[in-house]
Amino acid sequence: RLYMLEVLPIQAKIEQEAICARCGVEYDADCMAYRATIDGFLTGICQFRMSDRGGVIRDLATVQGQTLNDRDRVESLFVLGRATLNFIDLCGVHRAFFDDAAFLRDNQGLVRSIGFTPEADGRWGMDLTDFFREPCKHG
């Protein structure tokens, strides 16, 4: 079946807070966020911020209690992650980190497919320089 997956920035903090609650993550007013929907139904959120070292994904999560099939779940999260990285890169920030330890525990393969790898200090990070110039190389 065909469906429409959309990933869009969340403009209003009140909406971000409500989506965080639905996804079981702590709302952080200092973070920016993207939301994912499939056919208009909310599927997930990515909260992130800019730091002095680079962009930082704080939370990547799907709606709690939702029965998404694995493909829809993975695709929603993958596109959320990549859209966030693209925004970070477009802001001229060419380093990114993945700091959602709880998500990482059960989803290392997905985090790797988004583009992150463990660094020497144990933190998962990546260099965004030219990453989106040839995105098919990173799929």
Model-predicted regions and their roles:
Residues 37-75:
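Conserved donor-binding loop and adjoining core beta-sheet/short helix segment
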Residues 70-89:
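Conserved acetyl-CoA-binding loop-helix of GNAT-fold acetyltransferases
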Residues 101-121:
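Conserved active-site alpha-helix within GNAT-family acetyltransferase domains
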Residues 88-101:
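Conserved GNAT acetyl-CoA-binding A-motif
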Residues 30, 51-53, 104-105:
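Short acidic/glycine-enriched loop/turn segments that link adjacent beta-strands
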Residues 32-35:
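Hydrophobic beta-strand residues of extracellular immunoglobulin-like
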Residues 1-28, 135-139:
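Short amphipathic alpha-helix that is part of the acyltransferase structural core
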Residues 114-139:
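C-terminal "cap" of GNAT-fold acetyltransferases
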